C-alpha cells in the first residue's frame, strides 16, 4: 500500500511508490492506480523482467520450430509436385525461425536474414506455397501485389502500407507482426523498364525496388494506424522489419529466353547439343537460373542481393493437374463432392473427365488456378437444377461432358409406390 505523509516539507501530502517505497520527490514520475502508486523506475524494471522472460521462453520453444522434414510433409499434403521448390522453402523457413528462436543467445556471429524468391510460370503454386508455410509456422501472413506499389509521394500504394496490413493481420500485436511472413506477388512486373536510365522517373518499376530494399533488409517503419498517407499530426506505430520473412514471387515471362541465350553461349563447339527454348519446358529452363539472369531481366543488383534463396517451380503437366484435382486434402473434386453431398447427391468424375479438364488448363496455359473456372462451367447447370430435382442420388461427369458434347448423367434413387412396385 502506498504511504502518505502529513509531515512538513514542500507539500503537506507526500506520495510514495507502493513497490520500492521511494517518494514522489525521488522519482521522475509516479503513476496512480486504485489505492496504489508505481514509479517510472519500477515500470522500467517490470519491462526488463518481461523482456527477459519473453527471450527465455523463445529459447525454450526450440521444439516449436518445425524441422525441414516436418514442413515438407505438410506441404506435400496440400501442394502437388514442386519437390525441389518445397525442399528449398522448407530449409529456408526452418533456418529463419530457428535464427529467431536463438537470437537471445550471446554470440559473436550475427545470422543474416535470407528472404526468398519464387520463380515459376502462372498457376504453378507460388502463392499457395507461401500461404501454406505461414499456416504451418502459425505466424501472421499477408499478400501484396507489386503492381499496385509506387514510391512514397506518388499516386498508388506506399511500400510501408505492406507493413500496416501485416500489423492488421496480427491484430495490431507489434511483436507478432515482427515475426510474420510477407508475400509480394508479381515482382517481375516492377523490373526496370529499360537498361538505360531515363530522365522520366520510373516510380512503379525501379523506384519500387528501391523502396522495398529497406523494409526487406530491416528497418524501423513508421506506420500510420489508419493507413493511407502520412500526416504530421498523426501518431505512428514503430515496426521493426528485421525479422519479417519476405517471399517474392513472379512468373518472369521471357526470363527463360535470357537463361537459354546464356546457355547457348557456353555450349558452342563440336558435339555440343543445344535445345531451343520451344523444345524445353519452362520449369526445366528455370532450374538453370543464375542471379545475372535476373539482372538482365531488369531487377537491380541490390534487390537481387536481398533475395539470396531462389526456388524455381515447374510448369504443371496433365498428370500433375489431375493429381491436384483429386489428391490434396482440400482438392477441388473433394470440395465439389462435399457441396453435392449437402444435397444428398454423390458426384462422380470419370478418369477421362479429369484428364479432359487438365488438358483444357494446359491448352489455356492458366495453371492450377484455371481448374476451378473450368469445374464451375461444367457443373453450373447441374448446381442450378439440382436443388429442385427430387430423387437424384448420383451425378456422373464423363469426358464428353467436359468437351461439351454431352450432359451430366443423373441417376435417380428407386422409389416404391403404395403397392410396393419399384420404379426408377
Swiss-Prot record:
Function: ATP-dependent specificity component of the Clp protease. It directs the protease to specific substrates. Can perform chaperone functions in the absence of ClpP.
GO terms, biological process: cell division; proteolysis involved in protein catabolic process
GO cellular component: HslUV protease complex
Naturally occurring in which organism (per UniProt): Brucella canis (strain ATCC 23365 / NCTC 10854 / RM-666)
Official protein name in the record: ATP-dependent Clp protease ATP-binding subunit ClpX
InterPro entries: AAA+_ATPase, ATP-dep_Clp_protease_ClpX, ATPase_AAA_core, Clp_ATPase_C, Clp_protease_ATP-bd_su_ClpX, ClpX_bact, P-loop_NTPase, Znf_CppX_C4
Gene Ontology MF, one: ATP-dependent protein folding chaperone
Residues in ClpX-type ZB domain copies: 5-58
Cited SMART domains: AAA, ClpB_D2-small, zf-C4_ClpX
